[in-house]
Design a protein with these regions (language model features):
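Juxtamembrane intracellular "pre-TM" segments in multi-pass secondary transporters
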Residues: 1-13, 189-221
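Helix-loop boundary and gating motifs at the non-cytosolic
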Residues: 5-60, 228-242
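Hydrophobic core of transmembrane alpha-helices in multi-pass small-molecule transporters
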Residues: 24, 101-119, 222, 303-317
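Helix-to-loop junctions at the C-terminal end of transmembrane segments
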Residues: 65-79, 161, 264-276, 360
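Structural signature of the two symmetry-related core transmembrane helices
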Residues: 82-96, 174, 279-294, 370-373
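Cytoplasmic helix-loop-helix junction between adjacent transmembrane helices
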Residues: 108-144
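C-terminal transmembrane helical hairpin of 12-TM major facilitator-type secondary transporters
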Residues: 278-322
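A late C-terminal transmembrane helix in Major Facilitator Superfamily
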Residues: 332-362
Length: 389
């Protein structure tokens, strides 16, 4: 009798552990590629700054179109587990092509199938609702795994790319997706769409207000991601070309920010019900403004590393609370809500990529940091019109 009673708990713990490991592995793959991508495009593919910007814009547009289509399909009848498996398999092949085929035009087609993370978070939310887990902290711990991956990934990426080659780095990312696919296949649950999900209670706003608030939140998160993506694209080149510091410092900065981001994310999740999502997002925006302004004045590695606490507050709240905000505004469409949040990052890449190369060629890297501060100002104004739930 005792054996029977403990079996479901063990199964649930194994499933939860599988979700955490999948989040970590997908995070590692992204953390290996993204920090070094602008250097890869500039040095390996000999792309000009404006072409680097166009790369991020084009790939993000394709990513939005594909992921939004799959999100609608999965909310109606699709099996999210199969979509995650498909995404992992395709990305594995794409990273292998990255390793051997250094062609700029083909590289712009490499991001449209990155639907693994939104679908994984949507599946995790549904699994938590069905099994009675506390949704906020479970989602926060999942997102923290990606942040943990970004502690390890960027320094490892620079070590592999600069110490060995970009080929070794991309093959390592491909291996991560192979392992990820095996875990998804063996341990993640399949949840049918025709079974009603019993969600934890949230405040249900009138449909018109929810749509308006969802649109405003989309603008808020898009502006926040655009500011962050401007920083991500230009920070490695700014550190090397403008400040004449070592290339490994860029990886260390990203890694430290990601490490500090984890406790910030967990603290935000803990206090969310006490102080509300909107106030937390406002704290994130103010922290981001202070961070980008301070980066312009910093000239030494020690100061650059110390400033990452502000970046961690900004990203920890955006990553941990932003997705939950969308899900609570769209409780009946968890997949679409999660993908909509993921697409704010892609819109951020579009905005950042569109202005990045042009502004660098006309002005300087400094102008981009001031632009990032302006974007956060727009986000703050829009946030004030969103109801806190």
């Amino acid at each position: 009798m005792q054996k029977t009673a403990t079996t479901p708990s063990k199964i649930l713990d194994l499933t939860a552990a599988a979700f955490l490991l999948v989040a970590f592995l997908t995070g590692i793959a992204g953390a290996l590629q993204t920090p070094t991508l602008s250097i890869f495009l500039a040095d390996e593919l000999k792309a000009r700054p404006i072409m680097v910007g166009f790369f991020f814009t084009g790939s993000a547009i394709m990513g939005i179109l594909v992921s939004q289509f799959l999100a609608r399909h999965s909310d109606k009848q699709g099996d999210r587990k199969l979509l995650i498996l498909l995404s992992a398999a395709i990305l594995e092949c794409q990273f292998i092509r990255f390793a051997w085929n250094c062609n700029y035009q083909r590289r712009t087609l490499e991001k449209p199938c990155r639907t693994a993370n939104p679908q994984m978070f949507a599946l995790a939310r549904e699994h938590a609702d069905r099994t009675g887990r506390e949704t906020v902290m479970f989602s926060t711990f999942l997102r923290a795994q990606i942040s943990l991956a970004w502690v390890i990934g960027p320094p490892l990426a620079y070590e592999l790319a600069m110490g060995f080659s970009f080929k070794v780095m991309y093959l390592t990312a491909a291996i991560a997706f192979v392992v990820c696919g095996l875990i998804v296949w063996l341990f993640l649950p399949s949840i049918q769409r025709n079974i009603p999900v019993v969600t934890q209670p949230v405040e249900i706003l009138p449909s018109t207000n929810r749509k308006r608030d969802t649109r405003l939140l989309f603008v808020v998160c898009s502006m926040m991601w655009a500011a962050n993506n401007l920083y991500m694209i230009n920070m490695p080149l700014f550190i090397i070309d403008e400040l004449h510091l070592t290339d490994k410092l860029a990886g260390e900065m990203i890694g430290i920010a990601a490490g500090l981001e984890i406790p910030m994310m967990l603290i935000a999740g803990y206090y969310m019900k006490r102080i509300g999502k909107r106030l937390l997002m406002l704290i994130a925006i103010v922290s981001g403004m202070c961070f980008y302004a301070s980066v312009l004045m910093a000239t030494t590695p020690a100061v650059e590393l110390e400033l990452q606490i502000l970046n961690a507050i900004f990203l920890g709240i955006l990553c941990g609370i932003g997705m939950l905000y969308f899900q609570d505004l769209m409780p009946e469409k968890i997949g679409s809500a999660t993908t909509l949040y993921a697409n704010t990052s892609r819109v951020g890449w579009i905005i950042a990529g569109s202005v990045d190369g042009i502004m660098v060629e006309i002005w300087s890297y400094h102008a981009l940091f001031w632009l990032a501060i302006g974007m956060l100002g727009i986000a703050m104004i829009c946030l004030l019109f969103i109801k806190d739930i």
